[in-house]
């Protein structure tokens, strides 16, 4: 009986870790998205083309991203191009 309880608790721990990781990084499971290629030597703030998180970049608004292709800003990291 103790073995089954320990096995069940281990399973719950693995599932909760997976759920927490997915909740903290919601963009990881989305397919068809690629990171923007940014040249070397740019400052870290210049790499991020979007102003607010999850904002869509627009070339007309002066926010260049992905050579004019649509993109989004994740919570953490560089803009992501939607290919």
UniProtKB/Swiss-Prot annotation:
Keywords: Disulfide bond, Ion channel impairing toxin, Knottin, Secreted, Signal, Toxin. Its main location: secreted. It is found in: Secreted. Residues 24-48 form a propeptide. Expressed by the venom gland. GO terms for cellular component: extracellular region. The presence of a 'disulfide through disulfide knot' structurally defines this protein as a knottin. This is U25-theraphotoxin-Cg1a. It comes from Chilobrachys guangxiensis.
């Amino acid at each position: 009986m103790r073995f089954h309880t320990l096995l069940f608790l281990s399973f719950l721990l693995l599932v909760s870790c997976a759920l927490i990781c997915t909740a903290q990084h919601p963009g990881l499971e989305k397919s068809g998205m690629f990171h923007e290629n940014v040249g070397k030597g740019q400052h870290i703030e210049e790499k991020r083309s979007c102003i607010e998180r999850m904002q869509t970049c627009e070339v007309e608004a002066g926010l260049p991203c992905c050579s004019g292709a649509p993109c989004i800003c994740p919570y953490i990291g560089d803009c992501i191009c939607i290919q």
